[in-house]
Amino acid sequence: MKKLIALLLALVMVVGLVACGAKEEAAPAPEAAPEAAPEAAPEAAPEAAPEAEAEAETLYIPVMAKGFQHQFWQAVAAGSQAAADEYGVEIYFDGPASETEIAAQVNMIEQEMAKNPKALALAALDTSAVADILDECAEKGIPVIGFDSGVPGDTSGAVKATACTNNENAAAIAAEKFGENADLVAKMQAATADAPVRIAVLSQDAVSASVCGRTTGFVNKMVEVASAYGTVSVEGHDKWANKVDGATIIIEVAVSATTEAVDVQNSANALLAKADLAAVFCSNEGTVTGFLSAVSDGEDLADGGKYEDLVVAGFDAGAAQKNAVRQGWFYGSVTQDPYQIGYQAVALAVAAANGETVSDVDTGAQWYNAENIDDEMISLLVYD
C-alpha cells in the first residue's frame, strides 16, 4: 500500500513539472505581437491622393482689355501671361480691334462667361454696357479685377480691386525730375518777385480722372519742390489755382479749350509766348502731340533752336514723343508700366478666386530719357 501511494505521488510530481515547463515555454509568445502590426494599417488610403489631384481644376481667368492692337496692350498681355505661368493658371487675353468697339468687347466677355471662369480681369470700355455681366458675376460669386482704367462706377459689388497706375504719383515723378535739373534749379534760385520763373503743366481737359490726377500730382509735388527755392504761386485754371502775391516761382496750369490737337497747340503757343517760361510738363500723349506741333515737331527745342533752354517733360509714349526724348529735345518723360498692370491684374484675380481679400495695387511708372530709352525694360514700356 505504501508503495502504491508513493507511486501515485511520483506521478503527480511529474505531471506538475511538465505543466510548469509548458507555461515557461509559452511566455515569450507576446514577442510575436509586432509581426501583426503590418496587417493593422492597410496601405490603400494614400492611393486616393492622385484621384484628388485629378479632380482639382486649373483656374481659368479671362483677361478682357480695352484693345489689342497697340503695343501698350501687348505689354499688358505679356505681363498677364507671366503671372499666369508663375501661378499655374490658364488665362485668355483679348480685346476689341478699336477702343470704340464697345459692343465687340461685351460680346467677347459674354463668350468667356459661358466658360464659367473662376475670376475675370476687366478693363471696361463702358461700365454701363457690362452692367448685366457684372451683376451675373456678383450673383455667381465670380470676383472681378479691374485693370488699367478698370471698371469705374461699378455698383454690383463684383469688382474687388483694380491694378492701375496711380496718376498723381506718376506725374509727381516729373516734378521730382524737374527738381533735379541743375539749370532749372539755378533759375528758381535766382528768381525774384519782379523777375519770376514760370513752370507750366499743359493738360487737355479738367474732367477725366487720369488727366486731372496727373495735373494734381504734378502741381502738388512741384509746389513742394519749388518751395525750397522761393515763394510759389499756382495760377491758371481755377480748379488748381492758389495765387500768392509776390511769388518768385509761378506754377501755371494751362488747360486747352477742347481735346482737339489744334486747341492743345493753341494753349501751347500761349505758354510759349511768356518770356519767363522755364519748363513745361505735358500730362498725356495728346498734349505732347499738340506741344510738339507748336515747336516745329521738337526742332525748336534742339541746341540753337528758339526754345533750346526750355525744360520739357511728357507722359506716356508714342513715336513722336519717343523721338523727342531720344533726340534730347525733351528732358524726359514718364511712362506707365503696362507689363505690371497685366501681371498684377492676374495676380489679384488668382488671389480673389482663392477667396483671399484683395485691394487696389499701384502698378507704378518709370522715368525715361535719352540715356535709358533703349534699355530692355524701358523699351518694353514705351510703345509707338
Protein language model features and the residues they cover:
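Positively charged n-region of N-terminal signal peptides that target proteins for export
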Residues: 1-9
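A residue-level marker of the well-folded mature domains of exported/periplasmic proteins
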Residues: 20-384
